[in-house]
Every structure is written in structure tokens, then in C-alpha cells.
Amino acid sequence: MESGFSGGGGGSDFYGGGGGRSIPGGPGTVINVGNNNPQTTYRNQIPGIFFDQIGNRVAGGNGFSGKRTLADFQAAQQHQQQQQQQPFYSQAALNAFLSRSVKPRNYQNFQSPSPMIDLTSVNDMSLFGGSGSSQRYGLPVPRSQTQQQQSDYGLFGGIRMGIGSGINNYPTLTGVPCIEPVQNRVHESENMLNSLRELEKQLLDDDDESGGDDDVSVITNSNSDWIQNLVTPNPNPNPVLSFSPSSSSSSSSPSTASTTTSVCSRQTVMEIATAIAEGKTEIATEILARVSQTPNLERNSEEKLVDFMVAALRSRIASPVTELYGKEHLISTQLLYELSPCFKLGFEAANLAILDAADNNDGGMMIPHVIDFDIGEGGQYVNLLRTLSTRRNGKSQSQNSPVVKITAVANNVYGCLVDDGGEERLKAVGDLLSQLGDRLGISVSFNVVTSLRLGDLNRESLGCDPDETLAVNLAFKLYRVPDESVCTENPRDELLRRVKGLKPRVVTLVEQEMNSNTAPFLGRVSESCACYGALLESVESTVPSTNSDRAKVEEGIGRKLVNAVACEGIDRIERCEVFGKWRMRMSMAGFELMPLSEKIAESMKSRGNRVHPGFTVKEDNGGVCFGWMGRALTVASAWR
């Protein structure tokens, strides 16, 4: 077929014509054709006359006759494509393997200094529908140029022709027209790219924590990129997570955590307690190892509370301590009763209830015979004698001097005597009260009963007259007596029944408002934090730090807390109850609540406000509650 040009042409020499030239394919259309002679160059094409020849070509034109058959051409194309893909996948796999330890940094508008294969050309198909080859035949094409080139291509009958601005940027295979892939094959190329990226993420354990759908990945980055990241690490790496209880979130602290932290909070305490309650001793021990207890005299009440709680939890894991019977603890307990208004006002409320039960006649005031099961250092009765003296001074001095008779029962727990100084100490207390009574013009009769077992408790064993008026004081006594949760004998209820058999006119009960007896371990920890935390804060706010007794009181509170949290069974002495449970227990023993008079409540309120505005006094179901900042710490009540 004549082409109209010198030098031969036409369809017969499409693959092997003598020289590269433009062949007219129709009105106003040309197709670029090269031959197999590398020395022959393309002729300069006339701008503005490029048209689509395929649209005007007659279908079924198979009259080409070349040096190679179609099958040979397709086989050559497939072989060349395999050779191009093999180094690409080898390079991609190498990049993925070498990038496992360091995740490359992604930069916007990054241009790789070392070229790589453009993935969009891997799956391109030729005009002949075979296992197609790339239009660029494996040459490196920057992504920006590829996108610009694709935007310049036109679509004709579903086939994109290689005409436009990017057609001559790179040499093409001689003898083959530069034809772009079919349009629907572009989606397959994108799918393959996405698949490779997913494979990359799986190999690198990439969870997209850097955020965003970043197109610049390990595959599209060059070797020099991740090598640069190895040489120059990220100046702001992810900091090590610091230890925190609350929390198990993935947020990190601004500074690197050390192996031991001096910061501990109530939340940390609850985390340790939860681990212990769930039997995860190793986890609890690990957390405790991170918490330091650096002695600091300037620590506030909250920090001291946490220190006590940590010591209690450590003791819970190791060997519990039982040091509540020592002389040091007895002294600290008495100091607590004297320095803390919540305890001191509770004793005073009990004294007022005892004085209200006295008989008034022409011969003078007849104070009931007081039976005390835990007199301590006698501080409560020092205040009782002074209050009685104040009342007496307000009346006619013609009356006879009042007589106060007190019987102190040696301290016993679970039916056994406790070595707290015994009879000698109690006699010393009696001597002190007698001397004070003499100065105040009050006659004091003080008796001591020792070696008395619970089953032998009666009027006769106490030295009481059959028709004598009695008052039994149980202030801060019952919480230390075991109940049915400790032993089947239930000494707590047995003591109440024995006291009921004495037929007293009044029974005074003062106890801490705290649920630490039968509460589960976690409940005890939470309750101890709330109760003893408020108590420590009240001591800190009312007792000057220069007072040497303050440290002793705080240490005593710490021992009480440790016993309540760390010990179980008979070793746990601190078994406080809330007022509601005491009401039920007293009612079951046959007692009836005697609401404290409004006069007593108002007197306690005025005294509490004079000490510190943070102390609160309120009536609650017949009892008077004393607390700190709204938290009830002690409750006083009277029974008959």
C-alpha cells in the first residue's frame, strides 16, 4: 500500500520500515512509528496536526505483514514485563524487610532522590489485550509527572492513546506505538497498589498511629529516605508511659518515667488493693515496688494517708503486724482522744448523758455508779468532774458534796486479760481522779476489777449494791470486741447481754462512724481512705506542727489503719461499724434508744465551732455525729 512518502512505508513495513516517520492514517491524523534500526531518528513532527488515527481506522484491518508474528511480539512483551517486575518486587520486599525496625518518616511533597518504578505502570495493558506492558517500559517516572501525563491523555473508544505533552519524554520501544492501557485497567492498578500497601502495613505492624491516609509509604519512599531516618532519629520520640492508676489509657506523660516514682495517690492505692483482692499478688508487688516512701517531715495529711495505706498493703502481702497492744500505741490513742475534737466531744456528750441520769433531791445530786470497760488514762472522767463542779457552782452551796463512784474493769478482749499495765496503771488513774475531786470539792470513789471473765460479769462481781443506780460507759470499747464474724462465741453480743443484765439506767455508746467490720477487703480500703484521711486532715488543721504529740497521734492513726486493712480474723482489732448497725445490735440485745437532749446537741455544736469551723456536729436518728468537712467520724448515743 502506497503511503505517499518516499522511503517506503505502509502497513507492510509497520514493524520494520526503513526509517522513523509520520504515517498518515486518515484526514488530519498521524501515528508515530519507529523501526528496529537504533541509528535512525524520528523526524521532526509538525505541531498541531495530531489526531486519533484509531477512530478512523477500518475494523478488521489485519493486513499487516512484519518481521515478527503477533504471538512472537506478545511473548517478547511478557518476557520483558517479567524482567521488569522481578527487580521491582525484590526491591519492595527488601525495603519492607529493612524498614521493620524503623518506621520511615513521611514528608509532604517528598521527591525521592533515587528513582523507583512507578507502580501505576505495573499492570498496564497493551492494545492487544495481552499481559500488557508499561507504556514507559520500566523506566522511572516521578509520581508528579505521571499524574500530569495522565491528565493530558484523551479517551477514544475506551482506549487511551499515547499522544500529548508526555509522549516523547522517554524513548519508547522501537516498532511499537505508544499506547496507554484501557481505562478500566487503571482501577486494577490502583487495587494492586492498595494491596501492596496493606501488605506493607502488615509486615511493619503499622496501625496508622501516625494518622491520615498518607500516600507516601515505605514502598514509595526510596532507600535513602529510611537510611536517613536511621542516621537521624526522630527528635521527639514517643515518651515512655509513666505509671498511673487511673488508668490504663494509652496517653503518655510529658517526661520519661523512672523505675521508681515518688508520686502515689488514692487511685494507685485502689489499684494495688484491687490486684490483691483478685489474687494478683505479683501485679500488686510490682506496683508497690514503683512507689517510694521517702521520709519527709513536710508531708501533708494526704501524703501521710497514702504512706500509711501503702504500708498497710505491703503488710497485707507480707506478714501482718499486730502492735495495737503496745504501750506506745496506748499512749498515742489517749493523745488522739485529747487532741481530736471529734473524739473529745464524743466523750463529753457521753458525760452529759450520764449527768442527766443523776438523781436530784434535797440531799444533793446522786450520780450513778459508773462502770467503765476501757477507762484508759481517765481523761473522760477528768472532764466529767469539771462539768459536775461547774453545775454545782451554779446551785446552792448548802447541798452536800456530790459523790462520784467509778469502777474500772481491766481491759480484756475475747475473754482474756491484756497486758496494758493492768491493776497498777488503773490504780494510778484512780489516784489522779481522787486528787482532782478533792480540789473540786467532789468525793471520788474509784475501784478496780481485774481477772474478770465475760461469763462472770454481774453486779456482785463488780461490787455494786443490788438497788444502786448504774451507768455503763462503752465509749470506744465495742469496736475492739470480736463479733460473730470472728468466732462463734460472739463476745460482742455476749458483752451487751451481760450489760443489759446489770439493769443500768443509762448506757453510753461512742464509736467511730466507719464500716470496717464485715465489709469486703476493697470496701475496707476505700472506707479507711475516707475516714482516716478526714481524721488526719482534721488533726493537721487543729494541732500545730510544733506540738510534739501531733506526730505520735498521726503514727497511732497509721497503726489503726494498717490493722484495719492488713489483718484478718482475730488479728484484726479495728472492727468499726456505722451507727445504723450499732442501733440494730443494741436493739437485738434488748436496749432502747434514748435520744440525746437538744440541749446536749446545741452544747456540742457551740464547742465544735469554737475549735475550728471545719468541724461539724449534727443530730442523726437519736445520736449526735461529729465530723470534719461533712464527713462523720464519731457518733455518740445513749441507751437504756
Curated annotation (Swiss-Prot):
One of its GO terms (molecular function) is DNA-binding transcription factor activity. Residues 242-262 have a biased composition (Low complexity). A motif (VHIID) lies at residues 368-372. Residues 333-408 are annotated as: VHIID. Expressed in seedlings, roots, leaves and siliques. Residues 428-460 are annotated as: Leucine repeat II (LRII). It comes from the Eukaryota. GO terms for biological process: regulation of DNA-templated transcription. InterPro entries: TF_GRAS. Residues 256-640 form the GRAS domain. Its main location: nucleus. It is found in: Nucleus. Residues 263-317 are annotated as: Leucine repeat I (LRI). Residues 470-563 are annotated as: PFYRE. It holds the Pfam family GRAS. One of its GO terms (cellular component) is nucleus. The keyword Endoplasmic reticulum does not apply. Residues 566-640 are annotated as: SAW. Keywords: Nucleus, Transcription, Transcription regulation. Residues 1-39, 227-263 are annotated as: Disordered. Belongs to the GRAS family. PANTHER family: OSJNBA0084A10.13 PROTEIN-RELATED. Probable transcription factor involved in plant development. This is Scarecrow-like protein 8. It comes from Arabidopsis thaliana (Mouse-ear cress). The gene is SCL8.
